[in-house]
Amino acid sequence: MRMIDIIEKKRDGKSLTKEEIEFFVNGYTHGEVPDYQASSLAMAIFFQDMNDEERAALTMSMVNSGEKIDLSDINGIKVDKHSTGGVGDTTTLVLAPLVAAVGVPVAKMSGRGLGHTGGTIDKLESVKGFNVEISEKDFIKLVNDNQVAVIGQSGNLTPADKKLYALRDVTGTVNSIPLIASSIMSKKIAAGADAIVLDVKTGSGAFMKTLDDAEALAHAMVRIGNNVGRNTMAIISDMSQPLGNAIGNALELKEAIATLKGNGPKDLTELVLTLGSQMVVLAEQATSLDEARQMLIDAIKTGKALNKFKTFLSNQGGDDSIVDSPEKLPSAKYQVEFKAKKDGYITEIIANEIGVASMMLGAGRQTKEDVIDLGVGIVLNKKVGEHVEKGENILTIHTNTKEIDDILYKLDNSITIESKGEAPTLIHKIITE
């Protein structure tokens, strides 16, 4: 088999066989296929697309390129949730203990964040002593004992994807549905999930800005999952404005605690209940979405979900007293109010710009080496569709420096007030095939 033949075949719009895809992935992973041929094939895929069989073969070749996490010793159906990312996306922090409280095993592998705010691990590390560097054996035991644990991304999972991702980044082939879908799904499958719930974001703060693109990606990932024997479904949710009210690590953790107590923002609570219901049904802990939703609402009302979160924190060395005393979490020196310049309705809060402002405060990383300031960030007091009066506080900036003119300027250009406005739809579609 020759790489040039595979490139020409795809360039001409023909379908590649499983063997041809495996030949490319194995060769590229081991350095036998040079970057220039890999980038040529990536560009051919970008223009000619791939059918469902090719996408599944590419995904599984990437899964098989490295180590796989074996979660078979964990009792029950392991359901993993993946979000395509956004601003103020606190869902994992609420969802993991919530679904665990009704018997869904959550064996979560999480990373650190690059960009607007930290990843799930950065947020959890706002809790003094919390440790994700645990052995696979301890990880499995924690999930069997308490239904929920989080481990740092470890081992050599999907090396082919890491290599191909870096190449796509510099060759103009990032925005290709088959390449994005296989990249995301290979990581989830290698991490040992039996079933997968996807939260595909759309809007200004999302990777997929339009609903059509988000839908195409959701269908692609769901089909890959179902084709390789993993029950998969997707929800398309709005990210035109930040999710919830908090953007920043400790601030988002405080918001997660409030949500587990039943006092969280409406949109975050609704998204968590929607995603959680799907997870509970896929884990076969309920027979209908309505039954699953009621189980989750009860777990919040009775305090079961909150207790699960406490045990989860203390099991991994974290100080669980922060659940009852969130003021113990890292906080910023100064709080600066950002006030409305006129009366009206908020029609726009550009999610990614708010995210960038939060990163400028120190809540996120621009490079891998950056140190995150866990206490800083932004808390929205108003959301799109809500009425404000001139001089009313729209958001509060939590900062450790008074030099924030550039951030105020950015916020000024990210929020629009007009004479009428309405709240965006939170959940656009549910995709099961």
Swiss-Prot record:
SUPFAM superfamilies to which the protein is assigned, alphabetical: Nucleoside phosphorylase/phosphoribosyltransferase catalytic domain (SSF52418), Nucleoside phosphorylase/phosphoribosyltransferase N-terminal domain (SSF47648), Pyrimidine nucleoside phosphorylase C-terminal domain (SSF54680)
Cofactor(s) demanded: K(+)
The EC number(s) this enzyme carries: 2.4.2.2
Catalytic activity: uridine + phosphate = alpha-D-ribose 1-phosphate + uracil; thymidine + phosphate = 2-deoxy-alpha-D-ribose 1-phosphate + thymine; 2'-deoxyuridine + phosphate = 2-deoxy-alpha-D-ribose 1-phosphate + uracil
NCBIfam families: PRK05820.1, PRK06078.1, Y_phosphoryl
Family, similarity comment: Belongs to the thymidine/pyrimidine-nucleoside phosphorylase family.
Protein name per UniProt: Pyrimidine-nucleoside phosphorylase
Organism: Staphylococcus epidermidis (strain ATCC 35984 / DSM 28319 / BCRC 17069 / CCUG 31568 / BM 3577 / RP62A)
Organism lineage string: Bacteria, Bacillati, Bacillota, Bacilli, Bacillales
Gene name as annotated: pdp
